Structure formats: structure tokens, C-alpha cells
């Protein structure tokens, strides 16, 4: 039976999962680390690179552009010589930081347990799946 309300709504299977788009923002390797480091205020590119261990210049550039495009941070260029570019969380970026802070805290608290579980798993004689 078709109702007027059901005709105006697309079928659930056809709806794109918009939550997945948000998870793409926060689920990559570097985005949350950038957001965490900007939570105390604006930073320049070199300050961010120094603060995030292991990130390449290219990956930091890609991550910053992506977060800027998504409205998580702003990029400000000051017309001085040499040009001064800084990055700062937007109000939406600040709420993302608040929402993800517990995840980063959980990660820090459980990293040793994760390492131990991985070592136990890797030490098993046969870890192949059927």
C-alpha cells in the first residue's frame, strides 16, 4: 500500500548514508590529530607539522585542504613578507573537537591493550581465516 508520505520519501536502501560522509572526515589517519592540535588556537603550517609526528608535508597539505573544504577549519593569509598563513578551527570544527575528544582519550588509555592484543593474535600458530 502506498501512502502520500511514503511516495515523497525515497526508499531506505536508496538513501545515501550521510553519516558516512562525516566518518570520512574524521576517519582518516590525520584529521583528528590536526583538529586536536588546533583546539588551543591558530597554528601555522610548520607548527602543525612539528606537532604531528610522522605526517608528511604533502599529507598535511591534503588534510588541511580537505578540512577547510568541509568547513572544519579556516585558512588565513596575512599580507606580510614572507606571507603568514595560519589555520584555525571554525565553530563547527570546535564542536567536532568536543565530540571526538573522548575517542582520542580512549585511544591513549587503551593503546597498550591494543598492542598486547595484536601481539597475542600475531603469535597464534594459525591466524588464517577459513
Label each PLM-derived region with a short phrase:
Residues 12-59, 79, 86, 94:
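N-terminal helix-turn-helix DNA-binding core of bacterial DNA-binding proteins
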Residues 68-88:
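Beta-hairpin "wing" of winged helix-turn-helix
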Residues 1-14, 69, 74, 91-130:
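C-terminal regulatory/oligomerization modules of transcriptional regulators
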Residues 41-42, 55, 67, 80, ...:
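The DNA-recognition helices of helix-turn-helix-type DNA-binding domains
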Amino acid at each position: 500500500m502506498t501512502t502520500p508520505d511514503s511516495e515523497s520519501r525515497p526508499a531506505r536502501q536508496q538513501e545515501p548514508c550521510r553519516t558516512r560522509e562525516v566518518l570520512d572526515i574524521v576517519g582518516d589517519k590525520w584529521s583528528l590529530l590536526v583538529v586536536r592540535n588546533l583546539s588551543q588556537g591558530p597554528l601555522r603550517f610548520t607548527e602543525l607539522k612539528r606537532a604531528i609526528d610522522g605526517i608528511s608535508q604533502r599529507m598535511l597539505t591534503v588534510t588541511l585542504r580537505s578540512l577547510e573544504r568541509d568547513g572544519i577549519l579556516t585558512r588565513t593569509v596575512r599580507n606580510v613578507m614572507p606571507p603568514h598563513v595560519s589555520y584555525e578551527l571554525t565553530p563547527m570544527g570546535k564542536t567536532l573537537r568536543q565530540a571526538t575528544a573522548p575517542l582520542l582519550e580512549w585511544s591513549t588509555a587503551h593503546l597498550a591493550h591494543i598492542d598486547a592484543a595484536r601481539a597475542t593474535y600475531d603469535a597464534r600458530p594459525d591466524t588464517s581465516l577459513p
